[in-house]
Amino acid sequence: MACCVALCCSVPTGPATTICSSDKSCRCGVCLPSTCPHTIWQLEPTCCDNCPPPCHIPQPCVPTCFLLNSCHPTPDLLTVNLTTYVQPGCEEPCVPRCC
């Protein structure tokens, strides 16, 4: 997508700090990972014009220990039965796939 090269990029605002913002020039198509302490991959540059996004935006990936950590407030889950299924061949959880 030549129209997206050398244009300014913008990233979704959130708790993470990225090296690319709307006031800096950067290459569109470079996926930026989140820098927050938890494994959440959801930040990605988008072109300022109407070009389609150059990368597939991966789904947020949160470790189970973060979701079920007792130090975080949990909703009313006392009556919910939790069953964990592990898919074979997934030794590396939360690995983002990008372009």
From Swiss-Prot:
Residues modified as N-acetylalanine are 2
Organism expressing this protein natively: Mus musculus (Mouse)
Q: Does the keyword Protein transport apply?
A: no
Q: Which superkingdom is the protein from?
A: Eukaryota
Give the start-end ranges of region 3 X 5 AA repeats of C-C-X(3): 3-59
An example Gene Ontology molecular-function term: structural molecule activity
Q: Which key words are in the record? A: Acetylation, Keratin, Repeat
- What name does this protein carry? Keratin-associated protein 3-3
How far does the signal peptide extend, from start to end residue?
none
How it assembles, according to the record, is:
Interacts with hair keratins.
Q: Report whether Nucleotide-binding shows up as a keyword of the record.
A: no
sequence repeat segments: 3-7, 8-12, 47-51
Question: Family assignment?
Answer: Belongs to the KRTAP type 3 family.
Q: Name one GO cellular component term.
A: keratin filament
One Pfam short name: Keratin_matx
Q: What does this protein do?
A: In the hair cortex, hair keratin intermediate filaments are embedded in an interfilamentous matrix, consisting of hair keratin-associated proteins (KRTAP), which are essential for the formation of a rigid and resistant hair shaft through their extensive disulfide bond cross-linking with abundant cysteine residues of hair keratins. The matrix proteins include the high-sulfur and high-glycine-tyrosine keratins.
